[in-house]
Amino acid sequence: MDKKRIAISLVFSIIFLSAVFYKVPVREVLNVLKNASPFWMSVAVGVMALTITLTGVRWDQVLRSQNWRLPFWQVIRATWYGHCFNTALLGPAAGDIFKSTLFAREQNMPLVNLLSASWLDRLLAGVGSIIFAVLVVIFTLMTGEQLQIELPSVNPWIIAAGVLCAAAVCFLIWKFRLLDKIAFVKKLKDTFAAAVVKMYKSPGRALTVILLGCVGQILLSSILAWTLASVTQTDLPWVQMLWVFPVIAMLATLPISVGGVGVREGASLVLLGNYGVVQADAVAASLLCLGVYWLNAAIGAILLFIGKPKK
């Protein structure tokens, strides 16, 4: 793992948290945390555990589409490894690499095959997440409510320049076949392409993975809602707020902080505040959400240290 990247992410997390606690006194947040409901917190922990397990089921389906029939519970266990790395490191990308590397050693399999399966799993799950996002917006609009969100004004020339730069980089990579000059990357690209073809020939499994991705996103997005329910003492417009939770969950996965620390709290403070959530409640709920992630990550770490079950 790049130490410079970790250092930068740590700095960003500190900056974001400092900004949050500059606006919301720490003492107020602590008072809210002391009165958190154990019941709703238990629900949040259970939902997170279910989400991780369903992610393992999803990955197992992708592996089976590639004719890799591995022991089901070992795939689930490796997925818990992945959650541990996702939380402790810098998001799903790093977590998938470490998870696949360890599992490849345990199962004596080619790393490129497991990485390809992991990324194909993410791709199809992303489709499920998009479907979920569309359904949330449609449901919210059908209730007659308006999305309370203010988009920052951005110079269109900046957007155009960014698109052109990205297009230029992609063109250069394609034109000069830069990826093909790195043996491992070329092999990984070819393996991924073959994995996509195999999955295309298994539409039933593909639809299952997409459906599980949608369900997983629903569960993942609900965790902050459960932790908010554990600390709030007021009635909230939950239906109007439906779209907020997946947005915050998505922002927390961006690789600009350590485990989403700071980003989740800042986003919760701003977005939940639009719906009358007390500032201290919003920050406390996001911190409890972080605690749920780390508690389940600790379970993944325990499974990692225990290692592969002996036959």
Predicted features by range, described:
Residues 1-80, 139-253, 284-287, 292-311:
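Predominantly cytoplasmic-facing regulatory/coupling regions of multi-pass membrane proteins
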Residues 68, 108-109, 234, 256, ...:
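Helix N-cap/coil-helix junction residues
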Residues 73-77, 95-96, 107-121, 277-288:
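Membrane-interface alpha-helices at helix entry/exit sites of multi-pass transporters
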Residues 76-108:
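Extended non-transmembrane interhelical loops and adjacent amphipathic helices
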Residues 81, 85-89, 115-138, 284-299:
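Membrane-embedded alpha-helical segments of transport systems
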Residues 83-91, 246-261, 265:
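Transmembrane alpha-helix interface/packing and boundary motifs in multi-pass membrane proteins
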Residues 94-105, 258-273:
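Re-entrant/interfacial helical elements at transmembrane boundaries that shape
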Residues 98, 102, 115-118, 128, ...:
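Hydrophobic alpha-helical membrane segments of integral membrane proteins
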